[in-house]
Amino acid sequence: MTIDYENAWEEYAKKWQENHPELTHIGDEWIGKAAGAANSLAEYEKLIEQKFIAPYINEKHTVLEIGIGGGRTAELLLKYCQKLICADISNSMLKATKNRLGETRVKYLKLDGITLNGIDPKTADVCFCYDTMVHLEPRDIFNYLTKIPAKLRGEKICIFHHTDTLSDLGWQRFLKDWDNNLMGKRNGTAHSVMTNAIMEKFLSHLKYKIIHQDTDSVPRDCIWICQAPDII
């Protein structure tokens, strides 16, 4: 299978303003409606903040966010954390986020899609990955899960969000674009085929401690709160 995540999101960014002339920030078009979570951007941001940020992140934390889009969740994270590392495979997404947030308390890092090189060991207290793994193939998710623990310190809290193809809304999403992703090729912005059982197997195999599994807040998807292992 060939997936060019980087080019897919660069192309998305190029066409974004034309496709969403009413919006100021890229990423604000993702309001959670198709996922069954919300009906407006404000409602979706409130859900993310109250359910997945406020309970786990405080003013002493450095947060590593993998997959930042246009900085929507990064802006929410900055309300709670001390420092934020914004890591993304797309230069355009990094630029859009920097324009939105500036550089105070924020570091920006271009990812290669395989490693987390450029992030020093034991740099962050929390890893936050929301609206990103929904696009990643299972093997790519597993790969990141093997790389994250070395970058964390302290309680090593992780918030991971992925799609569940077997949920009712996940299946609707699958039926929407399956025929555009054939012959071993898939657009990097499409949703992957992923399930909660696969993610649980990944986490358990790698010795992550599962704290909470949430399949209610975002009915199409699944969000895991877990603690990364010391060593993989």
Task: Please describe what each predicted stretch is.
Residues 131-132:
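Short catalytic micro-motifs in class I SAM-dependent methyltransferases
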Residues 128:
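A conserved beta-strand element that flanks and buttresses the S-adenosyl-L-methionine
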Residues 1-60, 66-120, 136-143, 147, ...:
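Class I (Rossmann-like) S-adenosyl-L-methionine-dependent methyltransferase catalytic domain
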